[in-house]
């Protein structure tokens, strides 16, 4: 639940080659914002760095947002530290239909993760969405499109890619935005030699939204 911290320090790195970790039933890791250092421009580096490392290991894993809720009553306040998963579903499932569609979306990487103040309702690269596989031909340049909605003015977005060894970041300046806005990002990417790609965007208060990886062949 809390990779690389507390009693999970050193994990899942330690068992990355074990069959149970490589199984498609092992989803990946969970993100609660700890440590939370607001002097940094982005939250979640502990878990997002793990997401990038797992992607470079060749493991198709994902990160879900979570929060510890031991008790809920009228005094409970968990909005400020509850990261939210927004699933790509055709319709909201009914209780009597069970959890199958929710679990499938999580397992397929068909969701984005938000701290709450920034949303990414649409994210495609070459027409493919997170969790899907894009076959990159020649030339290896493809178009990224992403819809962003936000509360506070935005600071930047980053296209994060990996080649199986290194992680690369390409920053998109969003400092000219105002509060309560929306924008469609469009950018042509050179994905030569890359094996995965994802997008994240952050506002001036370190609130952010993170796509799950899109896999490249």
Residue positions per predicted region:
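Catalytic cores of extracellular degradative/oxidative enzymes
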Residues: 1-61, 74
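C-terminal functional module detector
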Residues: 37, 52, 56-63, 67-217
